[in-house]
């Protein structure tokens, strides 16, 4: 018997031995700066907080195609990009998905800055990194976005 619970598969074999196998959803977030050093953030539809654009990878996507799709869906971005994977989160359980998630953070250099709310985005703007710490939110997405910014600064001082 196999069932999915709390983000992992619980399997019991014929002699009663139970095994837990974790399923991981891979999520990508894009750290994009403008020339003033501000960070691109999006407030998705039906959400009350600002976050870095990005989301879960779909089956058979690579990092670049997933980043392009997510940027199009959330911030209306159409164009080429360069990216550098530079950090990963610890495991997070996402109750609405019943899945454990690991988020990979990518510094993204878009070929243009034509950002408008996409089909999943409600508002899009650039903010000073410190403003993320002032966001009141039921989730830690704004603070996590700030930590990602600080990690990039620590590694590359850009």
Language-model segment annotations:
Residues 1-29:
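Acidic, metal-coordinating catalytic segment for phosphate/diphosphate chemistry
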Residues 90-113, 125:
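Active-site-adjacent beta-strand/loop module that shapes the phosphate/pyrophosphate-binding cleft
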């Amino acid at each position: 018997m196999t069932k999915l619970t709390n983000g992992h598969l619980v399997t019991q074999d014929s002699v009663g031995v139970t095994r837990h196998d974790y399923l991981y959803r891979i999520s990508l977030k894009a750290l994009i700066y403008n020339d003033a050093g501000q960070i691109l953030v999006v407030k998705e539809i039906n959400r009350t907080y600002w976050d870095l654009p990005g989301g879960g990878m779909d089956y058979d996507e690579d990092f670049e195609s997933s980043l392009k799709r997510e940027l199009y869906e959330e911030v209306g971005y159409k164009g080429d990009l360069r990216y550098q994977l530079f950090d990963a989160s610890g495991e997070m359980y996402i109750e609405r998905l019943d899945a454990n998630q690991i988020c990979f953070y990518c510094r993204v250099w878009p070929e243009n800055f034509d950002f408008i709310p996409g089909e999943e985005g409600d508002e899009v703007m650039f903010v000073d990194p410190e403003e993320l710490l002032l966001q009141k939110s039921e989730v830690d997405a704004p603070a996590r976005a700030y930590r990602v910014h600080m990690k990039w600064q620590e590694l590359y001082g850009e």
